[in-house]
Amino acid sequence: MSVTVASEAMSILANHVYVIPPDSDLTMDNYSFKVISPRSGRTKQVDLFFISMANEMSARAVGIVLSGYDGDGTEGCKHIKANGGKTFTQDMSAEVDYMPLSAQAAGCVDFVLPLNEIPDKLKSFAAALKT
């Protein structure tokens, strides 16, 4: 899968991984990205994007929470699950495990995996969506 830094009005393609640009917030609108820069500082960046993605993509949304602080991503994972999407977190191998542990404790995670196993599971999930 390709990994690309998201940009304003970029069309979202299948089988791509998008990364939030530095010092920016990212949302989705009409199946394209909306970049808010500079960051407002008042929002949790991952939650903001995951909630927007859950609203836009419903059951086709997939959220992956890796290493990080402050439990960012937990509320977004709840929204993804509530809309029928799938959520992943890195296991205890995360260098900073606050974000994945917060999402796991909230009960909104489908898969808890080592980082190196996430791509294969993600590919199998994506393949199942095609059928």
Identify the function of each model-found stretch.
Residues 1-131:
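Conserved acid/base catalytic micro-environments in cytosolic active-site loops
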